[in-house]
């Protein structure tokens, strides 16, 4: 089966993102296709490269990045939600006159069209 995941919780502070990550790993281990992960609302904090968890905690932001690098899973970040929460790529930082960007590599700013496309092309969309 082909899946898409929607993450609406931040990397830390709630269970949503870590549960979504574990679900993503289980899908791949069972031979399913994970087309994309769409980060929405507070979920966009999963793409902040400035996140620095304690040394004894799992680095969820880097975990998502590895999922992208190893399995080609698209990591789409809602651009409107990201900009409202201070998550920007180099292009947006330049356009907005900001000193720097903080979007972790492997993540892509995208619109809700990416979520709509995933809904149309995947067998299941699971929200966390």
Curated annotation (Swiss-Prot):
Q: Which UniProt keywords apply?
A: Cytoplasm, Transferase, tRNA processing
Q: Which residues form the signal peptide?
A: none
Where mainly found?
cytoplasm
Where, by residue number, is the active site?
78
Subcellular location, in the record's words?
Answer: Cytoplasm
- Provide one Gene Ontology biological process annotation: tRNA wobble position uridine thiolation
A GO MF label: sulfurtransferase activity
**A single GO cellular-component term on record:** sulfurtransferase complex
Enzyme Commission no:
2.8.1.-
Protein family: Belongs to the DsrE/TusD family.
What is the role of the protein in this entry? Part of a sulfur-relay system required for 2-thiolation of 5-methylaminomethyl-2-thiouridine (mnm(5)s(2)U) at tRNA wobble positions. Accepts sulfur from TusA and transfers it in turn to TusE.
* Subunit organization: Heterohexamer, formed by a dimer of trimers. The hexameric TusBCD complex contains 2 copies each of TusB, TusC and TusD. The TusBCD complex interacts with TusE.
Which PANTHER family does the record cross-reference, listed alphabetically? PROTEIN YCHN, SULFURTRANSFERASE TUSD
Q: What name goes with this protein?
A: Sulfurtransferase TusD
Organism for this UniProt entry = Escherichia coli (strain SMS-3-5 / SECEC)
What gene is it encoded by? tusD
């Amino acid at each position: 089966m082909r899946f898409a995941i929607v993450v609406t919780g931040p990397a830390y502070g709630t269970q949503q993102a870590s549960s979504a990550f574990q679900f993503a790993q289980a899908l791949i281990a069972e031979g399913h296709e994970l087309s994309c992960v769409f980060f929405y609302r507070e979920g966009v904090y999963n793409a902040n490269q400035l996140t620095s968890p304690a040394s004894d905690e799992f680095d969820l932001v880097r975990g998502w990045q590895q999922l992208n690098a190893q399995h080609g899973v698209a990591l789409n970040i809602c651009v409107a939600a990201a900009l409202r929460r201070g998550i920007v790529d180099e292009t947006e930082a330049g356009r907005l006159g900001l000193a720097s960007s903080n979007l972790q590599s492997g993540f892509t700013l995208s619109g809700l069209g990416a979520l709509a496309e995933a809904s149309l092309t995947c067998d299941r969309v699971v929200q966390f």
